[in-house]
Each structure stands twice: as structure tokens, then as C-alpha cells.
A protein has these predicted regions:
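Short, Lys/Arg-rich flexible segments
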Residues: 1-84, 92, 98-143
Length: 143
């Protein structure tokens, strides 16, 4: 059987070893970059649907929009890093921001649905991936 030895350049091997040591910090920065893109789109969609298309004057306090944000980067039980776009809790009146967002997204028997999360997810998927790729390239380039 034939035998082959592949010699990697020392600089490449050094960068790979540094990458391994900084995986968590790089993953945080990459996910943060993608999360910011998604957050901006969700925020703009939310502003567009809140108070629009109502038969009566809007009673929006702006609290739902202000509570929208990004979670810190977390590591799940399988070792995967993730970040979430969501609402901080609770509201000043004691109700749940997630409940209000769910009512807006899916509607009720008396209120028409005004989706803002699902359209944002569909619209920014490619942009998020591109932002994450460029953040990754930048971080790897700094090694």
C-alpha cells in the first residue's frame, strides 16, 4: 500500500491551533453579528405592524418594542452555541411580552394576525449568514 506524508506550513498550523483555543469567543462574535441583522429586521417589522390596520385607535405603549433584544450567546447541552431574538419579561402591567407578541403574530378570534417574526426570519436568513461569514473571516484573519 502506498504511503503519503502531507506537510502543512507552520504558519497555517499555528493559526489552526490559535483558532481552536479561541473557538468560544469567535462563535460569540459571529453569532452576535448575525443576531444584530435579525434584530434590526424584527424591530422594523414590529414597528410596521403595531397599531396598523386597527378599527379603533391604537393603545400601544411602545413597551413591546422597547423590550425587544438579543439574548447573550449560550451553549446548549449538546455544545452548540446559540443566540435568540426575543422580548424581556415582565411588562410593567404584569402581563407577558411573549403573549402580546404571540397575539400580534397569530391573531385571536377578534384580532387579525399581523405577522412580524416569520416574515423577518424569511427575509434576513441570507443576510444573517453573510454577516456571520464576514465576521468569521475577520476574526480568523486577526489570528
Amino acid at each position: 500500500m502506498a504511503k503519503a506524508d502531507v506537510k502543512m506550513p507552520d504558519e497555517f498550523l499555528a493559526r489552526i491551533s490559535r483558532l481552536g483555543a479561541q473557538t468560544d469567543s469567535i462563535a460569540e462574535k459571529v453569532l452576535q453579528a448575525g443576531g444584530e441583522v435579525a434584530l434590526a429586521k424584527v424591530r422594523s417589522n414590529l414597528k410596521a405592524v403595531v397599531g396598523s390596520g386597527n378599527k379603533s385607535e391604537s393603545r400601544s405603549t411602545g413597551e413591546l418594542e422597547r423590550s425587544l433584544g438579543l439574548s447573550p450567546v449560550m451553549v446548549d447541552k449538546n455544545g452548540n452555541h446559540d443566540i435568540k431574538v426575543g422580548f424581556s419579561e415582565p411588562r410593567s402591567d404584569g402581563s407577558s411580552n411573549a403573549k402580546i407578541a404571540n397575539i400580534l403574530e397569530y391573531g385571536t378570534s377578534t384580532q387579525q394576525a399581523k405577522p412580524f417574526l416569520k416574515p423577518a426570519k424569511s427575509a434576513v436568513k441570507k443576510q444573517c449568514v453573510d454577516a456571520m461569514k464576514s465576521a468569521f473571516e475577520k476574526e480568523v484573519g486577526n489570528l
